[in-house]
Swiss-Prot record:
It catalyses: (S)-ureidoglycolate = urea + glyoxylate. Disulfide bonds: none annotated. Pathway: Nitrogen metabolism; (S)-allantoin degradation. The keyword Transferase does not apply. It comes from Pseudomonas syringae pv. tomato (strain ATCC BAA-871 / DC3000). GO terms for molecular function: ureidoglycolate hydrolase activity; ureidoglycolate lyase activity. The lineage of its organism: Bacteria, Pseudomonadati, Pseudomonadota, Gammaproteobacteria, Pseudomonadales. GO terms for biological process: allantoin catabolic process; purine nucleobase catabolic process. CDD domains: cupin_UAH (cd20298). This is Ureidoglycolate lyase. Belongs to the ureidoglycolate lyase family. Keywords: Lyase, Purine metabolism. InterPro entries: RmlC_Cupin_sf, UAH_cupin, Ureidogly_lyase, Ureidogly_lyase_bac, Ureidoglycolate_lyase_dom_sf.
Length: 170
């Protein structure tokens, strides 16, 4: 099994998979008579059908034991999905490019600094939310509508990956 290298989350590195939601380097301007800075259009909500709705939820995630064997990725073919950390804690992100099935050789891992969220583009393969803390909360913006919006792919055993935030130096 290949151990994924965990990369810092940057806009350029993550661009093939979606948007990094952060204030650094974002368009911004003052509103509310100069009392509020608006960081504008950090990501776009993508829904496939005209009757779909963008919805906001909160996910409360529990940590998984590490190192973690990555045996499954999911995708949302009908809309984008954004995760914004509410408690300021770093979290892990595992993604693979859009395609009929994810390719383990093209799968990448990132770590958010806790002030960054992500917006997965429609159809991007990703692991369900991976918190580093014992429990963490995320604001989630995604799609509600008819039709299936979650495909899961299970890797063959020889294609599985390992995510280890604390690899031993050898």
């Amino acid at each position: 099994m290949r151990t994924l290298t965990i990369e810092p989350l940057t806009k350029d590195a993550f661009a093939p998979f979606g948007d990094v939601i952060e204030t650094d380097g974002s368009d911004h301007f003052m509103i509310n008579n100069g009392s509020t800075m608006r960081f504008h259009r950090l990501a776009e909500v993508d829904t496939a059908q005209p009757d779909d709705k963008a919805i906001i939820s909160i996910f409360r995630a529990e940590s998984l034991p590490m190192p973690l064997t990555i045996g499954m990725l999911e995708r949302h073919p009908q809309g984008s999905q954004a995760f914004i950390p509410l408690l300021g804690n770093p979290f892990l992100i595992v993604v693979a490019p859009v395609g009929d099935a994810p390719e383990s050789a093209l799968t990448r891992a990132f770590v958010s600094n806790g002030r960054q969220g992500v917006n997965y583009h429609r159809g991007v393969w990703h692991h369900p939310v991976l918190t580093i803390e014992k429990q963490d909360d995320f604001l989630v913006v995604d799609r509600s509508g008819s039709g299936n919006n979650c495909d899961e792919h299970y890797f063959e055993e020889n294609q599985r990956l390992v995510l280890d935030p604390n690899p031993q130096e050898g």
